[in-house]
Amino acid sequence: MRYLIFVCLWLTQYALPAQIDPANIEIARDQWGVPHIFAPTDAEVAYGLAWATAEDDFLTMQKQLLPAKGLMGQVFGRQGAQLDVIVHLLGARKTTRERYTTDLSPDFRKILEAYADGLNAYAARHPKEVLHRRLFPVDGQDLIPSYMLGLALLSQIDEPLGAIFSGRMGQEVDQERGSNAAAIAPHKTTTGETFLLANSHQPLEGLYSWYKAHVCSEEGWNMLGANFPGGVSLFLGTNPYLGWAHTVNYPDFTDIYKLEMHPERDLTYRFNGKWLKLEPDFYKARIRLLGLLPVGKKQKFYQSKYGITFETPNGFFALRTVANQTIKAPEQWYRMNKARNWDEFRAALDLQGITCTNIVYADREGHIYHLGNGLLPKRDPNYDWSGILPGDTSATLWENDFYPVDQLVQVFDPPSGYVYNCNHTPFRSTGPGDNPDTTAVPPHMGYQRPNDLTNRGARFQALIQQYEQVSYEDFKRIKYDQAYEQPMVAVPWFEPIFHLNPADYPEIQEQILLLRDWDRVADANSEAAATAILAYFHLESALQSGQSVLELDTLPKIRLVEALRSVQDHFVEHFGQPVVRLG
């Protein structure tokens, strides 16, 4: 039975902002506890969203905010300090201060300030829940760095940072996310409706976990969906007119440069034939150790023409990323929330504040769309941007010149009637005859190669092609499909493990027969599924120190055999038997 819990916000006078009247805000919770926030104005709704989110997950909201003030390490130790350092390396606070009033519209700044006011009010009312005495009050500017940090992490900035300090640069990033998104046009559905799938995989709790809400104002903001706790609007979902989903993608968002240092002058590097001095950009974290970075003392970072620069045993390296080139992500999501049709949604995309993640869109007019989204710089085609770049020339220094949305990889209203993405290449985002032209895209944009697939992407394509038209029940069956495609086109090097000759390896004959006869369905009761999945993880882990699984087409048979031996040993050690069920 559905029920509603109505919450009135009675706050202490010192916590109340003058422009927000909490009496105008109503938070109604449904039977699942999801807040439905109603108020006359968008600003009041933002205030209510902050309050409702704090009621449910004030801890995670503070985890999002602490790095913006450099306080995460003081509360959560070494792991927390990593985020403090990344925020510093991004220059997130400085960029926000410089651009807050110029890059964000006045009406959206009111939304940010109202959300901050709601947070401050909750913190004032619940002081025992506050994690650090210097965290509150917050203002609108304090909300922006968490967006920049989140987008940087979604852009896998931790990979190049780790590569710089470990000396393992140039290795391809493995794609471990598990998100799925799809849209089906009315002419492809049995009911003549538009279908949208938003299945973005994030942690169940903690940083960057989904928080579901419904916001509704009398100014046209009416959105049901989800964000990360601390988001001032919703990041995906639906409104009465349209909806969209996100999946993580892997274009070239970050570049690494090796500087040519002067042989005699300290901290002096060559740039365009001149010798320039590195500018100190030191940072002091509050704990003793931070992974590969020593902390607890002043950290010696520098600024060069390329941005943040590091001294390592292998030389000086600079890192340049798109994640800190804009502060417009929160406003773009807000404008997407309020869009009433394709034209308004498309105009919101032109803000280009969301620097990564694919977008899959559908609306009630029948339009569907897939965008290989990203803030991608116009790079000099004479350089190999997949590796380490020379840090001595303006030819490799991309500035504020990015490809506009209409030059990104995309598909709009394809005749095949569907678009989809499962973290795989955007060049396979619809029916075979409607996919984007790979030759029209410069290689230095760094999009995944046309053959970079995931099993989920391969399965969706194989399943959707079976239907002339798709019912809603068909759509759900496709979404909940648990099978692996045969052959495994996403990881072709793994397919031979299913075709080993059991007579050649009697000690693992049982495992080989299981895999040979497996229907490729990852059912909870399947022993073959457990064997295959653990063997894959064993091989993937063994390759991490050297070659990426993305670079493989084949693997020596002995490696596959060793993986099955390892699986058998693991099961015997931990379960007392050579095979076990998946679930």
Residues covered by each model-derived region:
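Proteins synthesized as precursors that undergo proteolytic processing into mature forms
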Residues: 331-357, 364, 437-496
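Substrate-recognition/specificity elements adjacent to catalytic centers across diverse enzyme folds
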Residues: 20-207, 215-233, 322
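Hydrophobic alpha-helical segments
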Residues: 354-467, 522, 535, 539-541
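Acidic, low-complexity N-terminal propeptides/linkers enriched in Ser/Thr/Asp/Gly that mediate export
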Residues: 108-197, 202-204, 364-368, 376-378, ...
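Gly/Pro-rich active-site capping loops and adjacent beta-alpha segments
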Residues: 44-83, 88-93, 243-294, 400-453
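Bacterial Sec-dependent N-terminal signal peptides
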Residues: 1-19
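Glycine- and hydrophobic-rich flexible loops that cap the catalytic core of alpha/beta enzyme folds
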Residues: 217-218, 225-227, 237-242, 246-388
